[in-house]
Amino acid sequence: MFTRVANFCRKVLSREESEAEQAVARPHMTIIPREQHAISRKDISENALKVLYRLNKAGYEAYLVGGGVRDLLLGKKPKDFDVTTNATPDQVRKLFRNCRLVGRRFRLAHVMFGPEIIEVATFRGHHEGSESDRTTSQRGQNGMLLRDNIFGSIEEDAQRRDFTINSLYYSVADFTVRDYVGGMQDLQEGVIRLIGNPETRYREDPVRMLRAVRFAAKLNMHISPETAEPIPRLATLLNDIPPARLFEESLKLLQAGNGYETYQQLREYHLFQPLFPTITRYFTENGDSAMERIIAQVLKNTDNRIRNEMRVNPAFLFAAMFWYPLLEMAQKIAQESGLAYYDAFALAMNDVLDEACRSLAIPKRLTTLTRDIWQLQLRMSRRQGKRAWKLMEHPKFRAAFDLLELRAQVENNTELQRLAQWWAEFQASAPPEQKGMLNELDDDPAPRRRRSRPRKRAPRREGTV
């Protein structure tokens, strides 16, 4: 009974709050003519233009919207193009044979042109006050939208989007940009501003907190004070997001070319902990531990590789980020269980990755590669005979060597630095020189550990057990 009353009160208060917001923030449309903006059709995907023109020809409104418009206005090349329209998903499917409908939470139409997919969304409406709330819109107890397929007008759609800079609409009918929420001004001033009441919008979808940080880092903008204020105290809402979705978001955050700046802001707004709880436990006040240094360096290196259009692998990123928690876990298991270090290390890999996968559903294909990179660290110091050549034949040797170099860079460890330097020279040498380097190792072998002999038991006396 109490639960019913609480849910009823929550729904009434939420509706009153939403109605108050709508009353205060009635959309006022500003039309920016072609001569006052930088968008040209030659910079837009031909397939996106085909979708827009066909929808217009069929009598529907259709606009380019979201990050594509934002990036074009900033002079950047968009990664993809999204379309919004007053046509329903079923109506869109009737117009395009190469279309399929996707999504339960948000019903979308994907129009496929080979590898390129043009996403088409119907204008969203306000979910409160609709007679069809129960079947088309559903909220969780924390206010999160679980399902939202209320359709509306372009004015309502503009208010339903997340940030003002993503709520700009480009029309191929008259080449204008429509702005209902002041997005153009925020774009010019470099402001990330959430549309509507920030706490309500974050509760609807907590991932918006991650998006705010990502856009601020990616676009070199700042988050407005009212948008930033609730983030630290609402950060734990991310624990309610499915781990698979958080994994995808983590790649967008850390492997999009602005990973280091994003990492700093994630820590500032307390958003790193829900994503990487294992790592956060090892943070220090001055931020200068070996683990924090290796995270900073691997993200800077990743950013440089992306800027130079080089490939990056999430498995290597995770191998570096979780390396020091892994070492501490392995040492703890070895001390508590009495196992050999190699066996304790193997168990620690399982424990660290299992905990990581509880918050981020890291796919097995990546955890397998991460394990390979870690296991090779234990073999890098064993180079005598043919071991060095065999090690170099391993598919993940190069990634393992890169991690070794990173470790040498962030640790004040002369032995580790010499080992990394040896491997760098060995890889760059011709076979005869490599053989000479290995002979030098044989001439100066590392001191062997003395194995303790098993104790001899005293002879058992008669009458004793």
Swiss-Prot record:
Q: Name one GO molecular function term.
A: ATP binding
Q: Name one GO biological process term.
A: polyadenylation-dependent RNA catabolic process
Q: What is its EC number?
A: 2.7.7.19
Any keyword ATP-binding? Answer: yes
Keywords of the record: ATP-binding, mRNA processing, Nucleotide-binding, RNA-binding, Transcription, Transferase
Q: Note the superkingdom of the native organism.
A: Bacteria
Q: Where is the composition biased (Basic residues)?
A: 448-459
Reactions mediated catalytically: RNA(n) + ATP = RNA(n)-3'-adenine ribonucleotide + diphosphate
Specify where the region named Disordered lies, as residue ranges. 430-465
Indicate the secretion signal residues: none
User: Function of this protein?
Assistant: Adds poly(A) tail to the 3' end of many RNAs, which usually targets these RNAs for decay. Plays a significant role in the global control of gene expression, through influencing the rate of transcript degradation, and in the general RNA quality control.
Name of the molecule in the record? Poly(A) polymerase I
